[in-house]
Amino acid sequence: MLKTTLLFFVTALCEIIGCFLPWLWIKRGASVWWLLPAAASLALFVWLLTLHPAASGRVYAAYGGVYVCTALLWLRVVDGVRLTVYDWCGALIALCGMLIIVVGWGRT
């Protein structure tokens, strides 16, 4: 379970970075060269999703829970926004959903 969660976390970071770098280019006028590491990050994101033994749709659904939590961590650390009680509650619900799906992988 820990290995799966850690893999989902790294996958989420790759997706967020792959989307954040083009955002910097478009919104903040960063160099167009940031699109190269963005593309590499998104390619790594896709590859990491293939490392799970479950069906792709199940992997995507479970990954979503960890993505929500990782995005909120990004919001706090990178964007400097303080999380609200609604953020924490949403993260908890998302993680519970991920846990239910992952535990069920071996039972189907």
UniProtKB/Swiss-Prot annotation:
Cytoplasmic side: 27-30, 82-84
Topology relative to the membrane: Multi-pass membrane protein
Broad class of the protein's primary localization: membrane
Keywords linked to the UniProt accession: Cell inner membrane, Cell membrane, Membrane, Transmembrane, Transmembrane helix
Any single Pfam family the record assigns to this protein: UPF0060
Transmembrane segments: 6-26, 31-51, 61-81, 85-105
GO cellular component: plasma membrane
Protein location: Cell inner membrane
Residues exposed to the Periplasmic side: 1-5, 52-60, 106-108
Family stated for the protein in its record: Belongs to the UPF0060 family.
HAMAP family: UPF0060 (MF_00010)
Full protein name: UPF0060 membrane protein YnfA
Native source species: Salmonella paratyphi A (strain AKU_12601)
